[in-house]
Amino acid sequence: MDLSALASSREVRGPGPGAPVNRPLLPLLLLLLLLPLPASAWYKHVASPRYHTVGRASGLLMGLRRSPYLWRRALGGAAGPLVGLPGQMARSALLLPSPGQELWEVRSRSSPAGLPVHATRSLRDLEGAGQPEQSLSFQSWTSAEPAARAFGETLRAQPWFLQQIIFADPVRLDDRLKNRWRPRA
């Protein structure tokens, strides 16, 4: 077989050693156009780096420390400028309890059985304790006001989605037609 005859044929066999290689580059260039432009980090517009809402553990720390805006608002205008205060007083003025710290204190004040321990009773509680016949009367058991007050207190302690369930229409499964068992014919 003559190789010179094959080389002189006009068939397209692919680029030779000196041909430009632009066909594989075209998809790569198109792929680069599809990539997004470099942007700043997603949290930059949320908070500045000195706050606890930025960083690796920000999701864990957000509930533990209050925002500086909250403690400034809690101090109010009554505290005045903090520049004139001595060092120890200025530090104690800025350390307001966070909701996480308050929950921890409530939990640490509870008994080992999980029941809350109340520190001191008010004068009204002490007066009511001296009159057991009034607290055990039929009127106190059937009164709607303490029950409504207790329901409101427990309702406020529930998350919003449980509150929605409480106020939804109570429908028993027996009342719905589709839940009734029907023998098939």
From Swiss-Prot:
Entry keyword Ribonucleoprotein = no
The reply to whether Ligase figures as a keyword in the UniProt entry is no
- Signal sequence coordinates: 1-41
Propeptide residue intervals:
74-185
The organism of origin for this protein: Rattus norvegicus
- Cell location: Secreted
List GO molecular-function terms, semicolon-separated: G protein-coupled receptor binding
Q: Which UniProt keywords apply?
A: Cleavage on pair of basic residues, Neuropeptide, Secreted, Signal
Biological process GO annotation list?
Answer: feeding behavior; G protein-coupled receptor signaling pathway; neuropeptide signaling pathway
What the entry lists under InterPro entries is as follows: Neuropept_BW_pre, Neuropept_W_pre
Instruction: Tell me which family the UniProt entry assigns to this protein.
Output: Belongs to the neuropeptide B/W family.
Any one GO CC term of this protein is:
extracellular region
* Entry-linked Pfam families: NPBW
Give the superkingdom in one word: Eukaryota
Q: What does this protein do?
A: Plays a regulatory role in the organization of neuroendocrine signals accessing the anterior pituitary gland. Stimulates water drinking and food intake. May play a role in the hypothalamic response to stress. When injected into the lateral cerebroventricle, it elevates prolactin (PRL) and corticosterone and lowers growth hormone (GH) release.
**Name under which the protein is recorded:** Neuropeptide W
| PANTHER family, per database record | NEUROPEPTIDE B (PTHR28553), NEUROPEPTIDE W (PTHR28553:SF2)
